């Protein structure tokens, strides 16, 4: 391509799927490693506008397929000029499956992570930086409960390094709000009504691997100083509809997870033709973190009986 | 319970406290054109920008005396624009010489399921209205001239009636805490709008 920073250019992308929200996406090169910040959408009537950040060379085509937002309604073949605006608006991402990898027999968490990453590297995946997903739990303060007359609910506030300017707030089996990072400031103001559950912060950190159209993130789940488990996230970039690509994702998962391959995530279940969004990924992480929290509690309650 | 006053503290817990400085006034409908004309001359050169917004005010009642207020605003004429959630603190009392009303503000852009989420958190809608008007900018100052419309049927933004025969004029700046020279600039700008409109510091408590 040989594009310099800020140099305008135009590409055509063929429609891949019409109907519904009408956006077409086609993926060509897949290495957005040149940009630190996630990119997205400056959109206006059928033309998506992206701004190339300085220093990003030819792997720009990779970004386009990430960025087309179905909401725009790009009915006809979209034309893109080369201006990518970094944005916090996580509007769309490829179908993603988040699962837990059990720790191998007789090995530590770190050793199992190394086994997995070595397998990925042998497959041909390229390391592309790190990632972090964290989650804090809040519960309705006792003082508010009396007037509401309902059981206290748990609210999870999560962050994903893939979208550094965003904050995700969700209730279990409830709506997931996508907001900007000022939401954290608001939670501080709401201290009297929502209290952070003690020692509840849980996070997963690890490396990102790119393998063709798949983005694999293997992370160590930690609560405080202790490692509690391993998370594996796999995203298939080109597709935004879960039912269209689950079998392909499953095959890929089997190739490196083997017998530990998970079943279809619950978020896929109800809405077969709905467009996948980052909020769905955060719901999967919340479920994973809750599962790991419960596992630890089980181990801890067993000990006195031994 | 409100957070402790964020008076002069620019930073609390790693985040910058933003304050909203506000001056308000109003003009009768028939004076609107001359005001718009003057503003177009004084303000930054830009395409005249109109807006139609639907604002809902939510309250969370706890055992504290005053409920927690959040304002959710969405655009009715710009499809795809994010929803805007705003928290406004109590007006800072104190310096009588300060020319503008100062209060802590937190602005958050959110996805469209904001109202469902707020209900899940325990907030209940107190009232809603539609605001329709013009927006001007001068540097960091924002001047908004708008009319408030009462919503007759809850949730139906097409069926509205004007609340009064006048337009509300607001001059506001959102800046980090501790920058009081901002209110001087605002007062100087407000002087230029006299006698078309008198913008002044109006304490909401005095009206209640």
From Swiss-Prot, chain B:
Modified residues annotated as Phosphoserine in this record: 66
Record key words, sorted: Activator, Nucleus, Phosphoprotein, Transcription, Transcription regulation
A Pfam short name: Med18
Biological process per Gene Ontology, one example term: positive regulation of transcription initiation by RNA polymerase II
GO annotation, cellular component aspect: core mediator complex; mediator complex
Subcellular localization(s) per the UniProt record: Nucleus
Listed GO MF terms: transcription coregulator activity
Entry keyword Transcription: yes
Signal sequence, start to end: none
Alphabetized InterPro entries for the sequence: Mediator_Med18
Quaternary structure and interacting proteins, as annotated: Component of the Mediator complex, which is composed of MED1, MED4, MED6, MED7, MED8, MED9, MED10, MED11, MED12, MED13, MED13L, MED14, MED15, MED16, MED17, MED18, MED19, MED20, MED21, MED22, MED23, MED24, MED25, MED26, MED27, MED29, MED30, MED31, CCNC, CDK8 and CDC2L6/CDK11. The MED12, MED13, CCNC and CDK8 subunits form a distinct module termed the CDK8 module. Mediator containing the CDK8 module is less active than Mediator lacking this module in supporting transcriptional activation.
PANTHER family: MEDIATOR OF RNA POLYMERASE II TRANSCRIPTION SUBUNIT 18, MEDIATOR OF RNA POLYMERASE II TRANSCRIPTION, SUBUNIT 18
Function: Component of the Mediator complex, a coactivator involved in the regulated transcription of nearly all RNA polymerase II-dependent genes. Mediator functions as a bridge to convey information from gene-specific regulatory proteins to the basal RNA polymerase II transcription machinery. Mediator is recruited to promoters by direct interactions with regulatory proteins and serves as a scaffold for the assembly of a functional preinitiation complex with RNA polymerase II and the general transcription factors.
Protein family according to the UniProt entry: Belongs to the Mediator complex subunit 18 family.
Name this protein carries in UniProt: Mediator of RNA polymerase II transcription subunit 18
Originating species: Bos taurus (Bovine)
């Amino acid at each position: 391509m040989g594009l310099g920073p800020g140099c305008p250019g135009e590409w055509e992308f063929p429609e891949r799927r019409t109907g519904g929200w009408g956006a077409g996406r086609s993926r060509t090169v897949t290495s957005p490693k040149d940009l630190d910040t996630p990119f997205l959408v400056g959109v206006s009537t059928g033309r998506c506008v992206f701004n190339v950040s300085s220093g990003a060379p030819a792997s720009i085509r990779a970004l386009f397929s990430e960025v087309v937002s179905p909401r725009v309604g790009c009915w006809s073949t979209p034309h893109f000029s080369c201006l990518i605006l970094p944005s916090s608006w996580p509007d769309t991402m490829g179908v993603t499956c988040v699962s837990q990898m059990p720790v191998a027999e007789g090995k530590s968490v770190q050793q199992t992570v190394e086994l997995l990453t070595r397998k990925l590297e042998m497959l041909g995946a390229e390391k592309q930086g790190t990632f972090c997903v964290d989650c804090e739990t809040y519960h309705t303060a006792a003082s508010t409960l009396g007037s509401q007359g309902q059981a206290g609910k748990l609210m999870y506030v999560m962050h994903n390094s893939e979208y550094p300017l965003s904050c995700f707030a969700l209730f279990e089996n409830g709506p997931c709000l996508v907001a900007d990072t000022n939401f954290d400031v608001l939670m501080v103001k709401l201290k009297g009504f929502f209290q952070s559950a003690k020692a509840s912060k849980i996070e997963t950190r690890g490396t990102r691997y790119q393998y063709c159209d798949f983005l694999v993130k293997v992370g160590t789940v930690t609560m405080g100083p202790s490692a509690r488990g391993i998370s594996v996230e796999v995203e298939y970039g080109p597709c935004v509809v879960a039912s269209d690509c689950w079998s392909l994702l499953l095959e890929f998962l089997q190739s490196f997870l083997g017998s530990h391959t998970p079943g279809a995530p619950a978020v896929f279940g109800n809405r077969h033709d709905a467009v996948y969004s980052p909020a769905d990924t955060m719901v999967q992480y919340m479920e994973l973190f809750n599962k790991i929290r419960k596992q630890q509690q089980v181990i801890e309650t067993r000990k006195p009986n031994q | 319970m409100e957070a402790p006053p964020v008076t002069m503290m620019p930073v609390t817990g790693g985040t910058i406290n933003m304050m909203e400085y506000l001056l308000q006034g109003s003009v009768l409908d028939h004076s609107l054109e001359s005001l718009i004309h003057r503003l177009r001359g004084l303000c930054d050169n830009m395409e005249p920008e109109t807006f139609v917004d639907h604002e809902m005010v939510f309250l969370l009642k706890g055992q504290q005396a005053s409920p927690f207020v959040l304002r959710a605003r969405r655009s009715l004429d710009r499809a795809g624009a994010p929803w805007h959630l705003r928290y406004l603190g109590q007006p800072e009392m104190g310096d009588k010489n300060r020319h503008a009303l100062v209060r802590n503000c937190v602005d958050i852009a959110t996805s469209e399921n904001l109202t469902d989420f707020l209900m899940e958190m325990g907030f209940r809608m107190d009232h809603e209205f539609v605001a329709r008007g013009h927006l001007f900018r001068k540097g960091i100052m924002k001047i908004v001239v708008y009319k408030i419309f009462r919503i007759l049927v809850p949730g139906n933004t097409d069926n509205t009636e004007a609340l009064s025969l006048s337009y509300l004029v607001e001059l506001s700046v959102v800046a980090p805490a501790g920058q009081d020279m901002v209110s001087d600039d605002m007062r100087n700008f407000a002087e230029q709008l006299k006698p078309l409109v008198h913008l002044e510091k109006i304490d909401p408590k005095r009206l209640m």
